[in-house]
Amino acid sequence: MGSSTNNTQSKATPSVLENEVNSSKSSVVSSTSSAKGLLRETTNHGTMETSSVQISESESRPSKMVLVLTLASSISGFMFGYDTGYISSALVQIGTDLSNKILTSGEKEFITSATSLGALLGAVVGGVLANLIGRRRVLLGSNIIFVVGTIIQLAARTVWTMIAGRFVLGWGVGIASLIAPLMISELAPAKYRGRLIVTNVIFITGGQLIAYFINWGLTRVSHGWRVSVGLCMVPPVLQFVLFWFLPDTPRFYVMNGNFEKARQVLRKVHVDPSDEFVNATIDEMIASDSTVPGNGPLQKAWKSIKIIHTTPGNFRALILACGLQGIQQFTGFNSLMYFSATIFETIGFHNATAVSIIIAATNFVFTGIAICIIDKVGRRRILLVGMPCMCISLIVCAVAFHYLNVDFSTGTVVSRGINGWGIVVIIGMILYVASYAIGIGNAAWVGVELFSDVNVRSIGAMYAACTNWAGSLVIASTFLTMLENITPTGTFSFFAGLCFIAFFFVYFLLPDTAGLELEETTDFLSNGFNVKQAAQLSKERKKHSKFAKSKPTV
């Protein structure tokens, strides 16, 4: 009887909520409070009988449509990865092609960091526009910007033209890096969300690996680096064509009051969902869609920014999302990806690009492993193992550089070719990259799922992406200078120290949100970070999930 009553209520609620949304703000507040009470009951008692969590466990398998949308969105990751990979080798291969002289360390830093600066600004604009015109349209715009930036680089004959091209391209990269994980998090069922978001990271690492292989093949080709730059135009053109025919996310349609379109997309992204499941899911989205006051789009965007800072649950989610992105950047990984070829060339390897492929391949393989374990093991546990491993690996590299006696200010080495300490550097970097790829390299990108309020999610994703690109800007513009001024040993020791500090951030503040619905997370963070409670809830959810699978259907 109780179950039947609940089902009837679930079916009725969406239509009632829609009428309330259209008629009065007070009714929405009442409905939202009711829905949050329902979620709170689920959190406190571990029961799944009165919410759509039970339904999502049994029905929310990813459909072919959600896989297509995930793959299409992840092309953004490929563009980001390809850009990171090709510039590492291009900095070695450019020679005197720009301004008729060899690039200085400062010019290399300017060329590399220009993309990060553009991406930082692009992420700000993309975060605001995502709520105003939709995730899909913003992504289409980023594709056009990406192509324009690539054309400017192809035509570059001076260092500053190259810098300008990479700055423009950075706008496209920044917007795309924000929108891709946002779209995937809003489309993916909770059970598969981590794995599907990591698909975007797989595309990032795949783009890096392919760029290294292409540059390796073009090593002896005159002006071959321009060919690898030109190939940058292929992914954005492909993504533009795909998304021209694909829909936006259900949550964006709910934000704009287009409930029927949201239902249509939900039916496409789930395998044969029942009306009860679709209605309950729309109900949760409407309940979490707190009305943002304001007359114009910019005023509403400003109100969203105020809400994310003044609502405790949203603000804690913001701390975690930005903290994870900051850890990802300031532990030094992108310094290796941007300048690995420069490092290997300086420590004596004849074909630095070929050696860099080892690093990119390690990143790709261990990101694939992360897909298999991230939802089963949990982000928190992976990070608590990965961060110490990164720290130890960086210390190994610091010791090896001490005995290599490399002077990065002049680029001189003791001997040319393979030597013992050079091999130790490679081993240390491989271990570091493996630990990064399986941990913070993936966990940072799932931080957007911590924002359950749909009105602030794109703003939260914007903050997280801005943190990422601000960190990338600092790393790209200072890494070679650090190698020259505080030595490689000092530089790698510095990053090891940051890894050590990051471990305690994760240990004390990051809860395990595995199994929580997207609409539950901010409510869960409303009265604290709840690290212990999250661990207990995760265990209870797994028990319920196993019980639901083993229980025969009637």
Swiss-Prot record:
Looking at the record, which segments are called Disordered?
1-57
Q: Which PROSITE patterns match?
A: MFS, SUGAR_TRANSPORT_1
User: Topology versus the membrane, per the UniProt entry?
Assistant: Multi-pass membrane protein
Q: What happens when the gene is disrupted?
A: Decreases myo-inositol import into cell. Virulence is not affected in a mouse model of disseminated infection. Simultaneous disruption of INO1 results in lethality.
Question: Could you tell me where the Low complexity compositional bias lies?
Answer: 15-34
SUPFAM superfamilies, alphabetized: MFS general substrate transporter (SSF103473)
Q: Which UniProt keywords apply?
A: Cell membrane, Glycoprotein, Membrane, Transmembrane, Transmembrane helix, Transport
- Localisation per UniProt entry: Cell membrane
Family, as annotated = Belongs to the major facilitator superfamily. Sugar transporter (TC 2.A.1.1) family.
Q: What is the protein name for this chain?
A: Myo-inositol transporter 1
* Organism for this UniProt entry: Candida albicans (strain SC5314 / ATCC MYA-2876)
| UniProt lineage | Eukaryota, Fungi, Dikarya, Ascomycota, Saccharomycotina
